[in-house]
Amino acid sequence: MEGAFAANWSAEAVNGSAAPPGTEGNRTAGPPQRNEALARVEVAVLCLILFLALSGNACVLLALRTTRHKHSRLFFFMKHLSIADLVVAVFQVLPQLLWDITFRFYGPDLLCRLVKYLQVVGMFASTYLLLLMSLDRCLAICQPLRSLSRRTDRLAVLVTWLGCLVASAPQVHIFSLREVADGVFDCWAVFIQPWGPKAYITWITLAVYIVPVIVLATCYGLISFKIWQNLRLKTAAAAAEAAAGAEGEAADWAGRAILARVSNVKLISKAKIRTVKMTFIVVLAFIVCWTPFFFVQMWSVWDADAPKEASPFIIAMLLASLNSCCNPWIYMLFTGHLFQELVQRFLCCSFRRLKGSRPGETSVSKKSNSSTFVLSQYSSSQRRCSQPSTL
């Protein structure tokens, strides 16, 4: 994530031998230097993030593909959010990892622009697909009869992806392959000085962080109010029913009136509340991971004396990518049956392969009495594989 849309500070030395992005001239004769110890820490952190993001989100997609409930609306949004997290891992974390290993960008100008473009596409997609999933949960709780249809879900996701592709387009113009020192080229940003970096980073912060957080907070505020209202009315209805037996018909009519008021919120089932809890934890992880990143990005462009080469400053920029690692584990926590089905299917199919490769099994199955037993046992194994558990 570091340097995705701002200057690619990386672990360059504090002596400032490399020319800053967006400036002409002012180059030095010697090659740029960097803090090698900090660079090794960056590489180690990015390797860990890449492994966790790839493995976790791949498991989520595989589990969603094999589950019997693959047409669930929540699972539909989870699938696209996992795809967005894979885009972050492949097109953002991996290029940054290679970049930190080589120190400089080794590739043509077209590749430089493409890498910077795709880095921000993943960032936008991960944010706005999470926002879309939260809006869906808000509608499911607050307006259950007006919730989105399957066709509308697909259209909303398609528009979100297209919007992310369009919103990332400025990266192609801002970044290019430039000479940052005598004979040294790198993929750098070109801004109109002095207000260009401030305007662009502020816009990105508003679009990717501040506005989504405000919308997410509003959604979960409405959800919390609706759940509180649901609990309060149900408690009142239970009290009225209890009083009906003691006070006669008048109390019975009062209880019915309260039950009529609560009928529309009875649709808030435990399953829906559980999905709300899951998306809330995902949103909380989003805020925790992205806040340090945007804080240091804004600090770097609005304060000329910002410690851009300090270790905490650099590491804070890497934390945003942790969001793509956290989401799969949150899914596992709240939808454990998905992964139980995946593991059961894997173990069952492995057992079938091992059983089919045993020598002498064919000759045994030809016996008149035992053949029925073997075939029935094998077919039941097939049924267990094709029909995963619903736990």
From Swiss-Prot:
Residues carrying sugar: N8, N15, N26
CDD domains in UniProt: 7tmA_OT_R
Record's subcellular location: Cell membrane
Record keywords, A-Z: Cell membrane, Disulfide bond, G-protein coupled receptor, Glycoprotein, Membrane, Phosphoprotein, Receptor, Transducer, Transmembrane, Transmembrane helix
Cysteines paired by S-S bonds: C112-C187
GO biological process: cellular response to hormone stimulus; female pregnancy; G protein-coupled receptor signaling pathway; maternal process involved in parturition; positive regulation of blood pressure; positive regulation of cold-induced thermogenesis; positive regulation of vasoconstriction; regulation of systemic arterial blood pressure by vasopressin
Cytoplasmic side: 64-74, 136-154, 226-277, 335-391
GO molecular function: oxytocin receptor activity; vasopressin receptor activity
Sites of Phosphoserine modification: S368, S370
SUPFAM superfamilies, per the entry: Family A G protein-coupled receptor-like
Listed transmembrane segments: 39-63, 75-97, 114-135, 155-175, 203-225, 278-296, 312-334
Topological domain ranges for the Extracellular compartment: 1-38, 98-113, 176-202, 297-311
Gene3D superfamilies: Rhodopsin 7-helix transmembrane proteins (1.20.1070.10)
Membrane topology: Multi-pass membrane protein
A GO CC term assigned to this protein in UniProt: plasma membrane
Family: Belongs to the G-protein coupled receptor 1 family. Vasopressin/oxytocin receptor subfamily.
Biological role: Receptor for oxytocin. The activity of this receptor is mediated by G proteins which activate a phosphatidylinositol-calcium second messenger system.
Protein name: Oxytocin receptor
Organism from which the protein derives: Bos taurus (Bovine)
Organism phylogeny: Eukaryota, Metazoa, Chordata, Craniata, Vertebrata
Name of encoding gene: OXTR
